């Protein structure tokens, strides 16, 4: 057998084909020249195949067993699109240009039904289909450039609607040439034609051309969703001639051009498949100038495209070619996560997976493809020996692989594997030599789990044969269970928000980090000390650990299976988490990734296992509605779990911290919470960033410096912002859920909480606020910070607890260099620094906002508007609670940052809870307001024209008043407006509460007739109200008139409210005759001037003319109708 060449180290990923779909096509009868596949699509559940006969085959990916067949008489299937957010819907386009949307009714176990057939593109060739990512809407593009949208309802809604109701079809836009590709994300539709790309805002109906330069030919474009880590915004990648891509922001502006022409001169990587042996040619070719017909977002960091020559996968953010492989005659490609389904021009389908090299080898080992696995190891040995790969593909597995090869036929492979295993030695052995401490015949290696594995050098020994037989049995069982279901083994892409990488993996493998659900070689993992005095002691430790492991596992299984109803939820939960990293540690912000293992003592490990069991038991109980919805029972469950949490993270188990707290510290805890300032200083000399000094400035001026290891328990006045243990992701989630629930329900201490081991009676006498502060400091690293923030504001409403929470956020933020840099520069520089270093949804934004507020005051608060909703008005209210006027200015600016028509709805959304309405109204009327002497006279009545005074927040006050509220709240708001003299709001509320008599009384005192004029004027509606108004005028005339108005003399102000002005309004409203009778009845007719008489005469003339005009029109209509009858 020839020597296998070695691929350069830079290639860390590979395309692999683990199964052939030819038997599936044969079973579907899609392998003939008459009937073959024409289109393909894939979703989480289905693989959809369209055929030349008009049939749509939907095959369930779970086992490739269940399938649906949907027939179409409208012609062959040309395009398929599966709904990404609901697997129950699929859209197809036929060769006649019809678009058919199916509802599969899988949840109701009904028959699939057509819910819509669109003929909008009939007679044209549909070239692209795309689903909306949020609602049931399909976008369709054809060869003449027309793009339409089909808005759908569910089948139930369609049946409930009237028969004449049609599904709306809307033409989105028409481009100048054939639509090549459609993509949709967050309200934006991306259209790529033969000449350029277009970006459409489907909600606002706005369109942008991307770039200025046109191109001619099929070039694709796709969205690249932003990642939660780093708060990256979505971008767009558009293919350009000459192996180039445009990077475009979400507003359609071209940011940069990426050139891949020279990078594609590297030789292609082989596709790992059992069909043929992988071959690699080191010869570097010429640069490739390609046109990318379509771009697809693959995995998390990659963009995929293809040509007639092969498949190309890029990491565009790094301008890097991850790989390219020769796969001929590709017609179309459908992707889901890291799976590729390639449709070839001959109708065949290839199922490929994008995997890291070590995961690919593991999959080959599980399938028993020993020769192919060995060749892959030898080809990619430079990638396999990296520290990241060696954690997954250990030397133990390579030894087993070597033992399965034929010594005669695979001698070259065995020799190369031996060399590869020798290169593993420096990381596998912690001793000076692999063979120095045991014997010349045997050696040992320390696995990642801590097990000492004895490796015999005698290949033909009985122990090796037993081991091989055990592994073979494991492989055969695993292969039997996973037959025709390889998609369940697919490694999922690394999650951008929670993955931990070392430096080497970051440079060589930036795409994904997958972990299989099970490990065939290690049935369980047992942690042992790093060094053991002898192999006998190690074996005894293995025996004890196995006994403890079996006992605890039995107890845990008994607990979890106690209720048969809980079996299914746990299975589904485990299935969702099957591809997550199971051993990634929770990292402290100040720690760096190193290859040294932390030494955990067995007692601590046992304690963590006990906490894991207690957490699983508590989470199981929370699934019971009788526990979850019964506060007393729920609190008992949390108290029981909290006792185990306190035991696990007890202070006495960590060095450098005393076991008892002094009485002075306990008695003055409240003062410490508010009076101490904590500063964290990195030890510059250590270089590793692992030791931290906490410098505490006490009230008396004494400064103490206590160097503490990052594993030590913080004392009563210190925060723990990172975990002292290595905690798995799944356990971290459960701990965060339970710890946050304890904070929300005020379960802050258990009955057994004590530093010295006895019940701490002093802690039971502390107030809930101080207990909450202590709880925050002890378990800050476990909390869900977003939920904790809301709980502190709603449950505790204490400045002490809020300040403690903010101090904890500051401790976490100090690891960010931007937090220190905020001390320098002006406010715009600080905001720009904040935008680039902190994610927009991070809870740490409050810590940064506090730092900016301390430096710049109110201007910093106004700048925080851009961080809404991450920083809410309630956060700002806590931040500047000593300066309410600053909060009021922030709130006013926040509301006015929205379009004016959205002010009421936005303010109503902010008023959560409802009690804020009265607080904010009281703030608004008491700040930047005129003095009460200018609005209210000595008797408590409104001063004339005082409603025209200027109020700083009048718009905000009126918005608060006009929002819907209950009757009691409206009455309280009325009293507030009256007491402060805000008469426009007071009159509005009086009329709304049907207190019209009170309103007209105050209108008379305000003495402004304009209040009763115009469309928005307050006019009496009944005869009794007019009599009341006239009576008020009579009463007013008996009192001495005011000497001057607000702006000087009465003549300078608005028209006053007097008998004549009111009489004119009465005549216009009721007619001159009825007005004159009412005035005579009230005894006011003698006070009227000639102006009133002339006005009444004019009104009578106008009334007669109007009656005559109406009479004439009626007569003409009557004559016309009679003439029509004749």
Curated annotation (Swiss-Prot):
It comes from the Eukaryota. Residues 477-490, 564-579 have a biased composition (Basic and acidic residues). Widely expressed, with lowest expression in skeletal muscle and spleen. Keywords: Cytoplasm, Phosphoprotein. The modification Phosphoserine is found at residues 532, 534, 693. The keyword Oxidoreductase does not apply. One of its GO terms (cellular component) is early endosome. Residues 461-514, 560-579 are annotated as: Disordered. It is found in: Cytoplasm, Cytosol. The keyword Cytoplasm applies. GO terms for biological process: blood coagulation; intracellular transport; melanosome assembly; pigmentation; platelet dense granule organization. Component of the biogenesis of lysosome-related organelles complex-2 (or BLOC2) composed of HPS3, HPS5 and HPS6. Interacts with HPS6 and HPS3. May interact with all alpha-integrin chains that have an aromatic residue before the first lysine of the conserved KXGFFKR motif, including ITGA2, ITGA3, ITGA5 and ITGA6. It is linked to Defects in Hps5 are the cause of Hermansky-Pudlak-like syndrome, a syndrome characterized by hypopigmented eyes and coat, melanosomes greatly reduced in number and morphologically bizarre, kidney proximal tubules secreting lysosomal enzymes into urine at greatly reduced rates, platelet dense granules deficient in critical components, such as serotonin and adenine nucleotides, leading to functionally abnormal platelets and prolonged bleeding times, and mast cell granules undergoing unregulated 'kiss-and-run' fusion at the plasma membrane. Belongs to the HPS5 family. May regulate the synthesis and function of lysosomes and of highly specialized organelles, such as melanosomes and platelet dense granules. Regulates intracellular vesicular trafficking in fibroblasts. May be involved in the regulation of general functions of integrins. This is BLOC-2 complex member HPS5. It comes from Mus musculus. The lineage of its organism: Eukaryota, Metazoa, Chordata, Craniata, Vertebrata.
């Amino acid at each position: 057998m020839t020597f296998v060449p070695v691929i350069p180290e830079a290639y860390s990923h590979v395309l692999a084909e683990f199964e052939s779909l030819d038997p599936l096509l044969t079973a579907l009868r899609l392998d003939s020249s008459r009937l073959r596949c024409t289109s393909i699509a894939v979703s989480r559940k289905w693989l959809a195949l369209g055929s030349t006969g008009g049939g749509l085959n939907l095959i369930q990916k779970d086992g490739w067993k269940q399938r649906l067949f949907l027939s179409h008489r409208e012609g062959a299937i040309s395009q398929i699109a599966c709904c990404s957010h609901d697997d129950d819907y699929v859209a197809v386009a036929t060769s006649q240009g019809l678009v058919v949307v199916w509802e599969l009714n899988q949840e109701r176990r009904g028959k699939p039904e057509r819910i819509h057939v669109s003929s909008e593109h009939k007679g044209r060739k549909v070239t692209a289909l795309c689903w909306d990512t949020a609602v049931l809407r399909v976008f369709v593009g054809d060869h003449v450039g027309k793009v339409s949208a089909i808005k759908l309802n569910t089948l139930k809604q369609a049946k409930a609607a009237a028969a004449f109701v049609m599904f709306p079809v809307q033409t989105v836009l028409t481009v100048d040439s054939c639509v090549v590709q459609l993509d949709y994300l967050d309200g934006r539709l991306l259209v790529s034609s033969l000449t350029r790309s277009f970006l459409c805002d489907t909600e606002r109906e706005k369109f942008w051309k991307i770039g200025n330069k046109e191109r001619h030919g099929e070039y694709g474009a796709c969205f690249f969703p932003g990642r939660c880590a780093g708060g990256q915004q979505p971008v767009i990648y558009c293919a350009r001639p000459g192996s180039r891509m445009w990077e475009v922001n979400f507003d359609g502006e071209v940011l940069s051009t990426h050139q891949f022409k020279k990078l594609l001169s590297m030789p292609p990587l082989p596709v790992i498949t059992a069909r043929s042996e992988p071959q690699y040619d080191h010869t570097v070719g010429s640069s490739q100038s390609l046109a990318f017909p379509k771009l697809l977002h693959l995995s998390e960091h990659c963009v995929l495209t293809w040509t007639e020559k092969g498949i190309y996968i890029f990491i565009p953010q790094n301008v890097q070619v991850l790989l390219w492989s020769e796969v001929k005659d590709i017609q179309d490609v459908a992707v889901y996560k890291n799976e590729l389904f390639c449709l070839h021009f001959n109708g065949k389908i290839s199922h490929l997976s994008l995997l890291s090299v070590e995961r690919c080898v593991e999959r080959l080992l599980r399938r028993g493809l020993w020769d192919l696995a060995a060749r892959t190891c030898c080809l990619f040995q430079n990638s396999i020996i990296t520290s990241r790969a060696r954690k997954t593909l250990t030397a133990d597995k390579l030894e087993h692989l070597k033992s399965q090869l034929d010594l005669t036929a695979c001698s070259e492979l065995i020799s190369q594997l031996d060399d590869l295993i020798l290169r593993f030695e420096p990381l596998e052995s912690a001793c000076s030599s692999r063979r120095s401490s045991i014997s010349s015949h045997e050696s040992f290696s320390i696995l990642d789990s801590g097990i000492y594995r004895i490796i015999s050098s005698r290949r033909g020994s009985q122990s090796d044969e037993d081991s091989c037989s055990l592994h073979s049995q494991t492989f055969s069982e695993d292969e039997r269970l996973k037959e025709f279901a390889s998609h369940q083994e697919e490694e999922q892409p690394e999650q951008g928000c929670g993955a931990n990488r070392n430096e080497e993996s970051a440079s060589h493998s930036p795409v994904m980090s997958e972990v299989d659900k099970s490990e065939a070689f290690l049935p369980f993992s047992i942690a042992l000390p790093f060094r053991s005095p002898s192999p006998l002691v190690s074996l005894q430790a293995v025996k004890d650990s196995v006994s403890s492991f079996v006992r605890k596992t039995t107890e845990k299984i008994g607990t979890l299976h106690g209720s048969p109803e809980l079996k299914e939820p746990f299975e589904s939960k485990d299935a969702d988490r099957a591809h997550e990293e199971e051993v990634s540690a929770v990292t402290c912000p100040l720690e760096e990734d190193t290859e040294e293992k932390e030494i955990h003592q067995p007692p601590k490990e046992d304690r963590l296992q006990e906490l894991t069991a207690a957490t699983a038991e508590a989470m199981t109980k929370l699934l019971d509605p009788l526990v979850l919805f019964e506060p007393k029972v729920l609190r008992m469950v949390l108290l029981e779990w909290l006792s185990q949490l306190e035991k696990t993270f007890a202070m006495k188990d960590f060095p450098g911290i005393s076991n008892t707290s002094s009485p002075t510290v306990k008695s003055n805890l409240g003062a410490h919470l508010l009076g101490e300032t904590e500063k964290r200083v990195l030890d510059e000399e250590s270089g590793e960033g692992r030791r931290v000094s906490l410098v505490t400035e006490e009230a008396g001026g004494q400064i103490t410096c206590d160097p503490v290891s990052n594993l030590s328990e913080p004392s009563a006045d210190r925060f723990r912002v990172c975990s002292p243990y290595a905690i798995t992701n799944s356990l971290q989630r459960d701990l965060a859920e339970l710890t946050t629930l304890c904070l929300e329900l005020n379960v802050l201490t258990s009955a057994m909480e004590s530093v010295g081991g006895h019940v701490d009676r002093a802690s039971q006498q502390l107030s809930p606020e101080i207990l909450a502060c202590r709880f925050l400091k002890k378990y800050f690293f476990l909390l869900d910070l977003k939920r904790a923030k809301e709980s502190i504001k709603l449950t505790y409403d204490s400045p002490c607890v809020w300040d403690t929470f903010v101090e904890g956020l500051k401790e976490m933020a100090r690891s960010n260099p931007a937090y220190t840099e905020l001390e320098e520069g002006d406010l715009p520089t600080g905001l720009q620094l904040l935008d680039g270093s902190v994610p927009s949804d991070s809870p740490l934004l409050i810590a940064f906002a506090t730092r900016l507020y301390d430096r710049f005051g109110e201007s910093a608060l106004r700048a925080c508007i851009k961080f809404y909703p991450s920083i809410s008005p309630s956060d700002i209210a806590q931040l500047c609670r000593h300066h309410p006027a600053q909060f009021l200015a922030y709130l006013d600016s926040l509301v006015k940052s929205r379009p004016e028509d959205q002010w009421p709805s936005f303010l109503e959304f902010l008023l959560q809870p409802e009690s804020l309405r009265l607080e904010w109204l009281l703030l608004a009327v008491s700040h930047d307001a005129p003095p009460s002497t200018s609005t209210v006279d000595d008797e408590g009545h409104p001063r004339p024209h005082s409603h025209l005074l200027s109020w700083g927040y009048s718009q905000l006050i009126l918005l608060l008043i006009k929002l819907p509220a209950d009757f009691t709240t409206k009455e309280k708001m009325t009293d507030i407006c009256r007491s402060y003299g805000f008469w426009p709001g007071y009159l509005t509320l009086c009329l709304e509460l049907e207190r019209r008599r009170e309103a007209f009384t105050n209108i008379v005192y305000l003495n402004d007739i304009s209040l009763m004029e115009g469309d928005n004027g307050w006019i009496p509606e009944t005869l009794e109200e007019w009599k009341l108004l006239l009576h008020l005028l009579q009463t007013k005339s008996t009192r001495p008139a005011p000497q001057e108005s607000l702006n000087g003399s009465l003549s300078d102000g608005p028209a006053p409210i007097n008998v004549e002005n009111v009489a004119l309004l009465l005549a216009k409203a009721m007619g001159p005759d009825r007005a004159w009778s009412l005035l005579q009845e009230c005894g006011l007719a003698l006070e009227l001037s000639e102006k009133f008489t002339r006005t009444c005469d004019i009104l009578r003339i106008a009334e007669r003319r109007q009656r005559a005009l109406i009479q004439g029109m009626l007569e003409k209509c009557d004559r016309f109708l009679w003439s029509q009858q004749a």
